[in-house]
């Protein structure tokens, strides 16, 4: 030790020294610190050999980064420590262990050489031995903080604090504490580069406070973890002891009893072979797993789903056609085709048994016609359970097929969930609003439904959650839609389309009388105070308070009347027992609708067209105005692309037939034609207004009026041929309601007349046409066709004299 003090004194006496440099990786050496260093680089070995051949003094300097070029002195810090090499030991792996002791801080003055080792000129930094009351106070604070750190730390030895407590020199105390703290290289180097002891102690106080906060938080976390581990171990030991006690007493523990009950349920559930094997396999995993394991609840939930699903339980089908027919007749008015189809299915099941595949019906019709309620009646007629799944707004394929069990919170798809609610394997399953399905990046649910609705595949439906084939073939699927256009073609191909058209006025009156009024009287507590609504009042409600093809809003209006009566009864006021048309304003307010009526006079340029929407049929007056201009055509009324093209075709037909119609062909270049379809706020589209547009344009050009009691529908070609259209039944009913008695329809639509009720057909005249030459004599008050050429059915032209057209009789069909 005397030699060491003498060496330090000699070093301190010199202003600068030239010494070899040992770069340190991920280490900062402090004065008085003794530490082993492991050296492998040739540059470092050369520096050590040079020091050993001299006075064993070497400058230990930390590298700024772990990976640097060996001779790159710019990556070395400028402040280091002179170290005395105590021992050098070569190891079997080729590295060298060097034991060094730090002595004094030095500042690098100049880098003298980098070959064969780094040599530098250094200036010794004299240690700061200043002593004051402030330094004494800081030493005490640092020691107190250091004591806390040593107590909280799991890695620092207890004698580290004892060693620090025995130091009286402030600089030595600061260096000792800094060398033992678990700091990164940057913070260690910052402490090394603080030459004034007061500043070093102040910085060390901050570092110790931060370290105390970290250690206390770590200690808190460790305690929490240990408590949980101890509790789990305690619970485990208690359960094991309880199990042993119960075994000694001949009792069964609850967990074992629960697992045994699960096993018995699996055996008794009459599962298919694959499902039973899967259930027993999962039960085996459950038995090997502690209840606290996260997977335990996942497997248990999966087994509950397997056991609660109906795998073989069925409802006995009704085998009496008369009973089924009576149920359908009591619950629904009309709908003859639908009822016949259901009775046919029951008859086939009676003859063929379970071998016949259940049909997949698609009820298509406007809102409120009874599609959903008809599904319930079908289930009642068949004696089966009824379940319903709404598909409106479903965008994710997983809604149909479910999620795999690898996902947190995974559940079966809505098909399997609904089957669990059904409780039997052969319910009537209604997929409501199938035309409202969507798709996005999560998949296409319509594609998943292809398997559900395919009788050849749905006996092995694959739900991702179950991961087992599930038999859907015994289900009678019924889908509902307002429109067929949005439904994917492959999906539509799997379904049998059953159209539910809108009700006519007389049907609505009968439905209200038989179903809606009794239902609302009971719902509003008027069974002891019954009321009646006259047929005239019902018709007035239908015509002016509702605008629909079904009866949903009609039921709301009847309910509104019943509620007003219920209030008067509750207030013990007088109320009418029979509702007449004159009372409707008092009960329902002013009527919001007014069905279109036929024009009260024959007009030029105004043709009556027959239209159809989801709310039913109606008539619309298409207007054409001719003004001086430059040959432009204007179309207004929010017309769609197809209807605009139809208007252009009608205009081209009129121009091509101008000579036959007595129109000056040059006139088209001097006029502007404006075609308008009223109710501009309502979008309109479709080709069926072609002949109506043509008649309106021809009337305006020839200045001949059109008959107000004639309505028409049909697509037009450039040669004047009339092509078939859709929605004829609703269009005829709408025109009939508007007071039209003569209707022009395409000849190819004659087959659709069977759908028109007989009582309506008897009161109207329907004229079937194939060409505009047949339309014009009936649509106009005076035939615009003059003596001249006329198109034949094959498109050729021939000179004819038109005969006088006699007006057809009511109830007739002109071919």
From Swiss-Prot:
It comes from the Bacteria. One of its GO terms (molecular function) is ATP binding. One of its GO terms (cellular component) is cytoplasm. The keyword Iron-sulfur does not apply. SUPFAM superfamilies: P-loop containing nucleoside triphosphate hydrolases (SSF52540), PUA domain-like (SSF88697), Ribosomal protein S5 domain 2-like (SSF54211). PROSITE patterns: LON_N, LON_PROTEOLYTIC, LON_SER. Pfam families: AAA, Lon_C, Lon_lid, LON_substr_bdg. ATP binds at residues 365-372. Induction: By heat shock. Residues 601-782 form the Lon proteolytic domain. InterPro entries: AAA+_ATPase, ATPase_AAA_core, Lon_bac, Lon_bac/euk-typ, Lon_lid, Lon_proteolytic, Lon_Prtase, Lon_prtase_N. Residues 19-212 form the Lon N-terminal domain. CDD domains: RecA-like_Lon (cd19500). The keyword Nucleotide-binding applies. It is an enzyme of class 3 (hydrolase). Its EC number is 3.4.21.53. The active site is at residues 688, 731. Keywords: ATP-binding, Cytoplasm, Hydrolase, Nucleotide-binding, Protease, Serine protease, Stress response. It catalyses: Hydrolysis of proteins in presence of ATP. It is found in: Cytoplasm. GO terms for biological process: cellular response to heat; protein quality control for misfolded or incompletely synthesized proteins. NCBIfam families: lon, PRK10787.1. Belongs to the peptidase S16 family. Homohexamer. Organized in a ring with a central cavity. ATP-dependent serine protease that mediates the selective degradation of mutant and abnormal proteins as well as certain short-lived regulatory proteins. Required for cellular homeostasis and for survival from DNA damage and developmental changes induced by stress. Degrades polypeptides processively to yield small peptide fragments that are 5 to 10 amino acids long. Binds to DNA in a double-stranded, site-specific manner. This is Lon protease 2. It comes from Herpetosiphon aurantiacus (strain ATCC 23779 / DSM 785 / 114-95). The lineage of its organism: Bacteria, Bacillati, Chloroflexota, Chloroflexia, Herpetosiphonales.
């Amino acid at each position: 030790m005397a030699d060491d003090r003498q060496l330090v004194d000699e070093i301190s006496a010199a202003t600068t020294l030239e010494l070899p440099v040992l770069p340190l990786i991920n280490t900062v050496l402090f004065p008085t610190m003794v530490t082993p260093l492991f050296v492998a680089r040739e540059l470092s070995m050369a520096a050590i050999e040079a020091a050993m051949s001299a006075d064993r003094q070497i400058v230990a300097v930390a590298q700024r980064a772990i990976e640097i070029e060996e001779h790159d002195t710019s990556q070395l810090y400028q402040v280091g420590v002179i170290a005395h090499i105590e021992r050098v030991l070569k190891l079997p792996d080729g590295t060298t262990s060097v034991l060094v002791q730090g002595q004094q801080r030095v500042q690098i003055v100049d880098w003298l050489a980098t070959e064969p080792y780094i040599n530098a000129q250094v200036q010794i930094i004299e240690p700061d031995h200043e002593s004051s009351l402030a330094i004494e106070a800081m030493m005490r604070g640092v020691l107190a903080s250091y004591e806390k750190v040593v107590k909280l730390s799991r890695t620092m030895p207890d004698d580290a604090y004892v060693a620090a407590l025995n130091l009286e020199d402030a600089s030595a105390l600061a260096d000792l504490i800094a060398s033992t703290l678990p700091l990164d290289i940057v913070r260690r180097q910052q402490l090394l580069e603080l030459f004034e002891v007061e500043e070093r102690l102040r910085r060390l106080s901050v570092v110790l406070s931060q370290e105390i906060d970290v250690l206390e938080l770590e200690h808190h976390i460790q305690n929490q973890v240990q408590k949980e581990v101890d509790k789990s171990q305690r619970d485990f030991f208690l359960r094991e002891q309880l199990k042993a006690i119960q075994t000694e007493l001949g009792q069964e523990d609850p967990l074992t009893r629960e697992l045994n009950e699960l096993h018995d349920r699996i055996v008794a559930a009459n599962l298919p072979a694959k499902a039973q094997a899967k259930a027993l396999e999962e039960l085996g995993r459950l038995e090997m797993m502690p209840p606290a394991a996260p997977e335990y609840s996942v497997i248990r939930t999966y087994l509950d789903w397997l056991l609660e699903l109906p795998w073989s339980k069925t409802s006995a089908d009704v085998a009496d056609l008369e009973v089924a027919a009576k149920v359908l007749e009591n619950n629904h008015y009309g709908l003859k085709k639908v009822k016949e189809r259901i009775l046919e299915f029951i008859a086939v099941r009676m003859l063929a048994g379970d071998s016949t595949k259940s049909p997949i019906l698609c009820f298509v019709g406007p809102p409120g016609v009874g599609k959903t309620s008809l599904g319930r009646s079908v289930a009642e007629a068949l004696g089966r359970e009824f379940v319903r799944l709404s598909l409106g707004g479903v965008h994710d394929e997983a809604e149909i097929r479910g999620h795999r069990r690898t996902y947190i919170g995974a559940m079966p798809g809505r098909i399997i969930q609904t089957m669990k609610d059904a409780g039997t394997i052969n319910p009537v399953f209604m997929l409501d609003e199938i035309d409202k399905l969507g798709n996005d990046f999560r998949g296409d649910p319509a594609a998943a439904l292809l398997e559900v609705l395919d009788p050849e595949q749905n006996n092995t439906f694959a739900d991702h959650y179950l991961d087992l084939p599930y038999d859907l073939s015994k289900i009678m699927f019924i889908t509902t839609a307002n429109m067929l256009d949005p439904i994917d073609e492959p999906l539509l191909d799997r379904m049998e389309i059953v159209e539910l058209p809108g009700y006519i006025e007389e049907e609505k009156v009968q439905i209200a009388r038989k179903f809606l009024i009794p239902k609302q009287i009971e719902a509003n507590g008027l069974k002891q105070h019954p009321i009646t609504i006259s047929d005239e009042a019902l018709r007035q409600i239908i015509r002016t308070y509702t605008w629909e093809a079904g009866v949903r809003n009609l039921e709301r209006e009847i309910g509104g009347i019943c509620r007003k009566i219920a209030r008067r009864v509750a207030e013990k006021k007088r109320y009418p027992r029979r509702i007449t048309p004159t009372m409707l304003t008092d009960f329902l307010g002013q009527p919001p609708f007014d069905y279109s009526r036929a024009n009260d006079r024959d007009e030029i340029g105004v043709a009556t067209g027959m239209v159809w929407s989801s709310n039913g049929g109606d008539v619309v007056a298409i207007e054409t105005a001719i003004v001086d201009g430059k040959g432009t055509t204007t179309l207004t009324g929010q017309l769609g692309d197809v209807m605009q093209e139809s208007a252009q075709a009608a205009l081209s037909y009129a121009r091509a037939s101008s000579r036959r119609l007595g129109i000056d062909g040059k006139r088209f270049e001097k006029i502007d034609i404006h075609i308008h379809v009223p109710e501009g706020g309502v979008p309109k589209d479709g080709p069926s207004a072609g002949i109506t547009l043509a008649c309106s344009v021809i009337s305006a050009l020839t200045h001949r009026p059109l008959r107000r009691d004639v309505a028409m529908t049909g697509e037009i070609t450039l040669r004047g041929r009339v092509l078939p259209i859709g929605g004829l039944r609703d269009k005829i009913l709408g025109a009939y309601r508007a007071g039209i008695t003569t209707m022009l329809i395409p000849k190819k639509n004659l087959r659709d007349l069977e759908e028109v009720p007989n009582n309506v057909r008897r009161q109207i005249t329907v004229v079937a046409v194939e060409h505009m030459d047949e339309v014009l004599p009936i649509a106009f008050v005076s035939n615009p066709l003059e003596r001249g050429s006329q198109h034949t059915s094959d498109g050729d032209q021939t000179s004819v004299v038109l005969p006088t057209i006699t007006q057809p009789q009511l109830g007739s069909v002109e071919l």
